[in-house]
Regions:
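Hydrophobic beta-strand scaffold residues
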Residues: 76, 187-188
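Short, surface-exposed connector motifs at secondary-structure boundaries
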Residues: 45, 130-132, 158-163
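Mobile-element integrase/transposase regions
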Residues: 59-126, 144-150, 157-162, 270-290
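C-terminal domain-tail junction helix/linker
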Residues: 182-184, 208-290
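Mobile genetic element proteins and their domesticated derivatives, centered on retroelements
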Residues: 6-10, 17, 33-34, 49, ...
């Protein structure tokens, strides 16, 4: 049976029997770029990878990146369970909505461990409007006095916020801290006990910090965790695409301060970042940390 007759019987165009997939000239280079970025940023999906590629000058859409992503067997990170909603269906506000930078800051603790099993508590501070991470400070133990010192360092650089949102942890509800905040003009905004979704911006940041940084590192000293955490903070603010900001970083213009008593930042500036296209927060082996 001829090809012409067979195609007529199945009502199929003859051109489909001669079609050959043509690969674009840049297909191999783009594939390498995607796999390199997926290796460097193991928790990023194809949408964030697309944003990084465009920043590098690639004229590529997310559909093409997704096709290569799936063809290469790259795994898209699983979705997190949805948190409690922040607003009702009619648009009325459940809680204070950030309207401009320095309107609402939120802070919370995240726990980690060094290689010897000892606990490290990291105090994270973010601006809810810009999503910028203003501080990650690590200590073995925290008191209200240390929290005041940490907040004062940031306020010298960024100004005083109108509101500070937090849970009801003992360090945050301490009388000395509340008195000091009142003196600066900042108002406290405590969430309801047992309702972490009311501090959703900071909880979301904490999950990214743990997923993209803490879960992939082994820390041998407090100096090491402080240096690497500060580098990750700078990476988060200046490089990492943020989905709610149109896949732009929260503060691409941010730079490391070099003085004003911000000890962790000064330490971080003494060890330059890796010379990678996107400024990975990880460094080469730092003998000084061990």
């Amino acid at each position: 049976m001829s090809e012409r007759w067979a195609c007529r019987l199945v009502n199929q165009p003859r051109g489909t029997q001669r079609y050959h997939l043509t690969r674009r000239e840049d297909e191999d280079a783009l594939t390498r770029a995607i796999t390199d970025l997926a290796t460097q940023y193991g928790r990023y999906g194809y949408r964030r990878i697309t944003a990084l590629l465009k920043r590098d000058g690639w004229q590529v859409g997310k559909d093409r990146v997704e096709r290569i992503w799936r063809r290469e067997g790259l795994k898209v990170p699983p979705r997190q369970k949805p948190r409690g909603r922040l607003w009702f269906n009619d648009g009325s506000c459940v809680r204070l909505r950030p309207e401009h930078p320095n309107h609402v800051w939120s802070y919370d603790f995240v726990s980690a461990k060094t290689h010897d099993g000892r606990t490290v508590r990291m105090l994270n501070l973010i601006d809810e409007h810009s999503r910028e991470c203003l501080m990650i400070r690590s200590e073995r133990r925290w008191s209200s006095a240390k929290v005041i010192e940490a907040l004062a360092d940031v306020m010298v650089l960024k100004g005083v916020p109108e509101h500070l949102r937090s849970d009801n942890g003992p360090e945050f509800v301490a009388r000395d801290l509340r008195k000091w905040l009142a003196g600066t003009g900042a108002k406290t905004a405590y969430i309801e006990p047992g309702s972490p979704w009311e501090n959703g911006y900071c909880e979301s940041f904490n999950s990214k910090l743990r997923d993209e940084f803490l879960n992939g590192e082994l820390f041998y000293s407090m100096k090491e965790i402080r240096v690497l955490a500060e580098r990750w903070r700078v990476h988060y603010n200046t490089i990492r695409p943020h989905s709610s900001l149109g896949y732009r970083p929260p503060a691409p213009e941010a730079r490391l301060p070099k003085s004003l008593g911000y000890g962790e930042v000064e330490t971080a500036t003494r060890f330059p970042l890796l010379h990678t296209p996107h400024g990975d927060y990880r460094s080469t082996k730092i003998d000084a940390l061990h």
